[in-house]
Amino acid sequence: MTTLLNPYFGEFGGMYVPQILMPALRQLEEAFVSAQKDPEFQAQFNDLLKNYAGRPTALTKCQNITAGTNTTLYLKREDLLHGGAHKTNQVLGQALLAKRMGKTEIIAETGAGQHGVASALASALLGLKCRIYMGAKDVERQSPNVFRMRLMGAEVIPVHSGSATLKDACNEALRDWSGSYETAHYMLGTAAGPHPYPTIVREFQRMIGEETKAQILEREGRLPDAVIACVGGGSNAIGMFADFINETNVGLIGVEPGGHGIETGEHGAPLKHGRVGIYFGMKAPMMQTEDGQIEESYSISAGLDFPSVGPQHAYLNSTGRADYVSITDDEALEAFKTLCLHEGIIPALESSHALAHALKMMRENPDKEQLLVVNLSGRGDKDIFTVHDILKARGEI
């Protein structure tokens, strides 16, 4: 099939979907390309970002956790966005695209519930019906977000098949869309899946990096030495990286979830520790068993618990333009506690992975002068029960 935009990033990406979905993907690509050139669409999107979501978000300089080092650390505060995370940015864009295509329903999948909440709020705002597939395990883990979605009129459908987590919710959402794409838009929640989703999601998240660049130049008079973001599917990271890719002096660091430790096999780091395969409509690195079945991913944070990764991250890794590392549950939890105690900010467990790597860079080279920006992709209100239970079990509270 000929496409308007390149469906690949190097060898990664593509459109590995049933033939029945090809017209829906083609229609979506056409709508996106025309919307990008339409000043009216852009004005509407920018108005929602500013006056509904609360952009631009702040760039906060850490006051205390860098004490005794030569590191200057800033946090890009996506946690301050309406809805509580970066997810709100791109769902507003996709919801406007859905309206542009004449769709009346939204289908979405969610892990931590953040994308579900974002999809529900965008649907409520723009008068779209919304149904959200969520792994039954995640429904239990993330009850506050489930209730938020239902408050905003979304139907939440628990998925009991397979591991009852995000990958199963993705499969069910795609199955639904196969039979309903004439009236429904599939609101994919990350920069992964079949073309054109990775490109659409990047473009609807790229204001994160654009704002960061302008803000850091204003505050410090120079670009950062590195920008750091957590990577599950990779939308907050690609949103931060996109505007810095051509700034070759700026390091791009993506942080995958190391779970209980890479050596245990219980992690969510397919980019560095998986094999390339085809899953979820794309060719990308993924966690696979010996015989090629998709393996369970694991992370303390439901939003990073994804067995594959967006194709552009795979490409940036293969070319060496970005570095990808992993952080364990315990390291992320320590970073979570550190930010709460010393800066008065409760970060999402997802974002705590990126923060943990920045703290590691700082501790390993305390005398090194470095200017770092962490994408604080979401707030941790949704995680306080998880953290409470862990700290209680350890006797720390």
Swiss-Prot record:
Q: What, per the annotation, is the impact of changing G281R?
A: In mutant TRPB8
Which EC main class describes this enzyme?
lyase
Active-site positions on this chain: C62 (nucleophile), H86 (proton donor)
Alphabetical GO CC annotations of the entry are: cytoplasm; cytosol
EC number(s) per entry: 4.2.1.20
**Which reaction does this enzyme catalyse, per its entry?**
(1S,2R)-1-C-(indol-3-yl)glycerol 3-phosphate + L-serine = D-glyceraldehyde 3-phosphate + L-tryptophan + H2O
| Subunit and partners | Tetramer of two alpha and two beta chains.
Its job:
The beta subunit is responsible for the synthesis of L-tryptophan from indole and L-serine.
Give the protein name, as stated in the record: Tryptophan synthase beta chain
Organism, per UniProt?
Escherichia coli (strain K12)
* Lineage of producing organism: Bacteria, Pseudomonadati, Pseudomonadota, Gammaproteobacteria, Enterobacterales
